[in-house]
Swiss-Prot record:
The keyword Acetylation does not apply. It is found in: Cell membrane. It comes from Rickettsia prowazekii (strain Madrid E). Belongs to the SURF1 family. GO terms for cellular component: plasma membrane. PROSITE patterns: SURF1. CDD domains: SURF1 (cd06662). It is a multi-pass membrane protein. Pfam families: SURF1. Disulfide bonds: none annotated. InterPro entries: Surf1/Shy1, Surf1/Surf4. This is SURF1-like protein. PANTHER family: SURFEIT LOCUS PROTEIN, SURFEIT LOCUS PROTEIN 1. Keywords: Cell membrane, Membrane, Transmembrane, Transmembrane helix.
Length: 244
């Protein structure tokens, strides 16, 4: 009875996980479709987005704040020099919002001259709104002293820059206003290429459930096979011999 209960409980858990992954598959598809529609649409003024800010393509007008750059470490596989940083600068809008903007990527060897990208002219930026990143336990902490960031944690950035930042940041589309050749522009297309692996996960859970039932049926079948008479007699003889 115990093994029957254990098998039944495990089967229910595995199939429940499978159906949960199917539900997540549907949610992720709607999410990715929403991102795709936002990316291909023209940017709208940030002030007109009243709710569900994340992943909207927006326009903001204002200026970059000088001497407040963040260097966010990141590898670009398609670049000639793969090791480098994303240039992240606070942008003060005409509505007095302060928003971190990811402006472009530069190679590690250009770190000492990227400060030339400072530009305090009033201009417009078009980009996609992104959520704050969470610091992961398996990653080293941000090296604020040397300005080497691994995670764009906006609460930590607010404290480090001594600014009241919005709880989202923007990935800018196209070439930066500085027009520096060393600062490579960013593409938003990769946002729509996020993998939706939930179908594979669902198949895995359902497969494990089926495998469990097959093993259980084989076990039950083998335990119900009658022992041949000659083997029973031999077993009795062995027991009698042991007694004697």
């Amino acid at each position: 009875m115990k093994i029957n209960f254990l098998i039944l409980t495990t089967f229910i858990i595995l199939t429940s996980l499978g159906f949960w992954q199917l539900s997540r598959l549907k949610e992720k598809k709607l999410f990715l479709d929403s991102i795709q529609s936002h990316i291909i649409s023209p940017g709208i003024n940030l002030e007109k987005v009243q709710e569900n800010l994340l992943y909207h393509k927006v326009k903001i007008t204002g200026q970059f704040l000088p001497n407040k750059d963040i260097y966010l470490y990141g590898i670009r596989l398609m670049a000639m020099e793969k090791d480098g940083y994303y240039l992240v600068t606070p942008f003060k809008t005409i509505a007095d919002q302060v928003i971190l903007v990811v402006r472009g990527w530069f190679s590690n060897r250009n770190k000492n001259i990227i400060m030339k990208a400072t530009n305090n002219q009033i201009h417009e930026i078009i980009g996609v709104i992104m959520p704050s990143e969470k610091t992961l336990s398996y990653l080293p902490a941000n090296d604020i002293k040397n300005n080497v960031w691994l995670t764009l944690d906006l609460k930590e950035a607010s404290k480090a820059l001594k600014l009241n930042l919005e709880n989202f940041y923007i990935i800018a589309e196209g070439k930066d206003i500085s027009n520096l050749d060393i600062l490579l522009p960013l593409s938003l297309n990769h946002l729509a290429l996020i993998k939706n692996d939930h179908l594979e996960y669902a198949i895995t859970w359902f497969g494990l459930a089926i495998f469990l039932i097959v093993i259980y049926v084989i076990y039950r079948h083998s335990s119900n096979i009658p022992v041949p008479v000659n083997k029973q007699l031999k077993s009795l003889e062995q027991k009698n011999n042991q007694k004697n």
